[in-house]
Amino acid sequence: MANTADVIVVGLGAMGSAALYQLAKLGSRVIGIDRFNPPHDQGSSHGDTRITREAIGEGGEFVPLVLRSNQIWEELEAATDRSLHTRNGALILASQSIHGDHHGSTSFVEDTIRAAREFGIAHEVLDAGEIRRRHPQFTLSGDELGYFESGAGFLRPEACIEAQLNLARQLGGKAITSETALDIQQEKHGMVEVKTDRERYSAARVIVTAGPWISKLLGAEYAHYFQIYRQVLCWFPLARNHEQYSPERFPVFIWIVGDRPCDMLYGFPAIDGPRGGLKISTERYDATVDPDAVPRTVSDSEIAAMYNEHIGPHFPDVSGDYLHATTCLYTVTPDAKFIVDTLRDGENVMFASACSGHGFKHSAAIGEALAFWALERPLRVDLSPFRLDRFWR
């Protein structure tokens, strides 16, 4: 039957496109369903670039995921002849007097250094003087501690998703777009039914990677584990010294300038030349939103506030006359880590909310692990740290 498969993947963003590709690669009859036409700009996997780094300050349990993901990105580049992953280095820095919680860590730079040492990841530890000498683009306070990882860089999220979806289709996978999954139900004979706004589909296993819509599919029992926050991505023009911001001279960065969550800045080099500007943004967790009713327009006052408080004081060459801006949704768990687990009442349905604002770099490995789970193969990475029961055991 056309609507029956071995596996159904609900949501084809970062994790879902990876799972669909891996399942098709393994010869599975797989159907993927997405409410939009990915890659799209309605969820969490858009905006031209995503930082990737091997030493993970959020916890050592993430490092094997990103290491395996990097291998898969290379495989995808070879298979598609597309540039997906650029290693131009990453600088992570913070004042040593700052101890606020950022991505679940109160000592993010130090935790990153520890992870690098534990896993043998090439890196340098820099003081403020050395950071200033190498990267005069930053206005420092003088007591910063820096971590530089030459093998880090950025991914092209839309290209990564598109590459995996195209390969999945070529390998026999089916990607159904502009169709909304409404309900997932266990059937009496051991199959799982996925009901959409158009059809009903059935499979032995279902993978739910629905991003900010995940709790709407899983139900009220799971809703409090997933808080959705609206984020703003901004591209600012360079007023001067354009040559200092090329990927060859300016790394991706994470800069913690204060104790509040919104004091974590991140950004990228001018990947499209001076006219493309710099993508620099912060993270905000002021209020949760409904993904179906979130304001998508970014106001001038939002941009002005971000620039005046965070961008202008720290980047003297960046102008406040922003080029463009868009919104992005973060799905955040209680401990800012991932949740990857099966349903309590359905061992043949696995869900992955692998985001919390730092998920894309891990998505290729998680997609592979989800595919291996669905086909009952041994996993290459350990997903046990991301089980839901950690919140009550």
Where are these regions (language model features)?
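Flavin (FAD/FMN) cofactor-binding core of flavoprotein oxidoreductases
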Residues: 129-133, 154, 288, 301-379, ...
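Beta1/beta-strand and adjacent pyrophosphate-binding region of the FAD-binding site
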Residues: 2-15, 31
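Short beta-strand to alpha-helix junction loop
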Residues: 64, 98-108, 147-167, 295-303
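Helical element adjacent to the flavin cofactor pocket in flavoenzyme catalytic cores
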Residues: 147-205, 209
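Dinucleotide-binding Rossmann-like beta1-alpha1 core, especially the glycine-rich loop
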Residues: 49-134
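Glycine-rich FAD pyrophosphate-binding loop
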Residues: 24-45
